[in-house]
Curated annotation (Swiss-Prot):
Record: residues binding a ubiquinone: 202
Organism: Strongylocentrotus purpuratus
UniProt keyword list: Electron transport, Heme, Iron, Membrane, Metal-binding, Mitochondrion, Mitochondrion inner membrane, Respiratory chain, Transmembrane, Transmembrane helix, Transport, Ubiquinone
Protein name: Cytochrome b
Other comment: Heme 1 (or BL or b562) is low-potential and absorbs at about 562 nm, and heme 2 (or BH or b566) is high-potential and absorbs at about 566 nm.
Gene name of the encoded protein: MT-CYB
Amino acid sequence: MAAPLRKEHPIFRILNSTFVDLPLPSNLSIWWNSGSLLGLCLVVQILTGIFLAMHYTADITLAFSSVMHILRDVNYGWFLRYVHANGVSLFFICMYCHIGRGLYYGSYNKIETWNVGVILFLVTILTAFMGYVLVWGQMSFWAATVITNLVSAIPYIGTIIVQWLWGGFSVDNATLTRFFPFHFLFPFIIAALAVIHLVFLHNSGANNPFAFNSNYDKAPFHIYFTTKDTVGFILLVAALFSLALLFPGALNDPENFIPANPLVTPPHIQPEWYFLFAYAILRSIPNKLGGVIALVAAILVLFLMPLLNTSKNESNSFRPLSQAAFWLLVAHLFILTWIGSQPVEYPYVLLGQVASVLYFSLFIFGFPIVSSIENKIIFS
């Protein structure tokens, strides 16, 4: 009897080993859906972005008007724009769930997969920031001015790099025209990095909630996990369409519906909600260079997780102290997100400083110390 085409054809064979016959631990929970949801979000963002780019004009005199043209005059342009604008919020929600699952269940022990994932996170942040600038509303313009100006804190070469980024001595037409092609290009780089991420993942094998050896109990990806992923897809699309159709501007800053004006500063400059935790850490340090270092360290600290891990048990499923530390970290992230949306005044500055110190303390001291204590309790 001839083998199925999916097992014989050189291209289909690769797809088959990735999406059909891939053996996975049978006890994977719903938290393992976030990876496939990220893939769906990326596809949606690329497709809607391509159609939006057909009608967008990367010029400071026309950028805001071209966005309004898309909303008013292009067939279903309003739908494309709001799906794209709200899709990035769901993208980051899925990404934070994915990172949180990795921290909780010890995915950082698969070092290559974890490091590529953190790089993916960084590239996604850059992509989203440049896309936010393209609207050329008030908050877009001033956020671009403030965030890019932080690079000037780098000793000796900072000012030169900022002027190179701007294409002049301020955020202007050159800045917008170079941000647009980079924003168009980066999603394809993200897709390539995602493939590398999957290659490393399939090479090392997926972990599972209990961190047990799963070689004795595995199930094929299709039809068990494709069915579960499909349920996640339906829920994600329902959430995205609900946002785009019923609450299209709920997650956008009202200031961004005003055309950019370099002569009028908004009362409170802030990035989109998914960057607020990092923004709160940035402004909690009064020194400019110190704030930039803290901002970058808030993301790069994820690279240190494999080195800081002291636990003999990979997963947190049977480690109550580590579970408490993890949820304390999640609470701090919510607090920092809330503080980032508040004015720079007492008591928000003080709360931000305390939450920032605790954020880094949990990563550098909290998790290793708690894991060492659990090792003594469990294995002594």
